[in-house]
């Protein structure tokens, strides 16, 4: 395991547990991620927790059980998110499915000199950007969950 910092997006938790790496099959993966949370290497913003709270499923239950996973939107995170939105206002949207959590997930990684982990895929344009598009433009490292697992050197 590395001592790199990772900021998890909603999609990494939700899609990770629901679709990609179900805990009924990949139980040890989630134990490893829980260890990374306990070690302070994985965090998410409380805006992600609010988004997950609207659900009634395994992802919500697991996230709620991770006491150290979510961090409040402290001033440096808010300031960084404001800078992100000044450059990329279309990262969030009142209509459609773009999440208000996205700039804060990126801001957390920026403030902690870390990497974003998301299951969003880049659109390849900044007109209607997703997390990987904005990360690429701002020079913030961004991985999907499989790439995160590989970066840890974990094998199963």
Give the residues covered by each predicted segment:
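Short, well-structured N-terminal submotif of metal-dependent ribonuclease cores
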Residues: 1-44, 51-64
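Noncatalytic, typically N-terminal accessory segments of nucleic acid-processing enzymes
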Residues: 1-3, 14-16, 89-96, 136
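Acidic, metal-associated active-site segment
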Residues: 97-116, 130-136
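Acidic, PIN/NYN-like endoribonuclease modules and their adjacent C-terminal/linker elements
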Residues: 2, 26, 122-156
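Acidic, metal-coordinating catalytic cores used for nucleic-acid/nucleotide bond scission
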Residues: 50-51, 98-101, 121-127
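PIN-domain endoribonuclease scaffold, especially VapC-family toxins
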Residues: 36, 46-99
């Amino acid at each position: 395991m590395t001592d790199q910092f990772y900021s998890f997006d909603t999609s990494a938790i939700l899609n990770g547990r629901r679709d990609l790496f179900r805990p009924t099959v990949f139980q040890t993966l989630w134990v490893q991620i829980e260890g990374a949370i306990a070690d302070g290497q994985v965090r998410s913003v409380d805006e992600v927790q609010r988004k997950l709270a609207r659900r009634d499923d395994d992802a919500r239950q697991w996230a709620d059980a991770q006491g150290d996973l979510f961090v409040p939107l402290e001033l440096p995170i808010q300031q960084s998110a404001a800078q992100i939105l000044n450059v990329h206002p279309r990262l969030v949207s009142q209509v459609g499915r773009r999440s208000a959590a996205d700039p804060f997930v990126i801001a957390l990684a920026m403030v902690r000199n870390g990497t974003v982990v998301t299951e969003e895929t880049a659109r390849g344009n900044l007109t209607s950007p997703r997390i990987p598009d904005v990360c690429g433009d701002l020079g913030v490292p961004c991985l999907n969950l499989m790439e995160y697992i590989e970066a840890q050197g974990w094998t199963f």
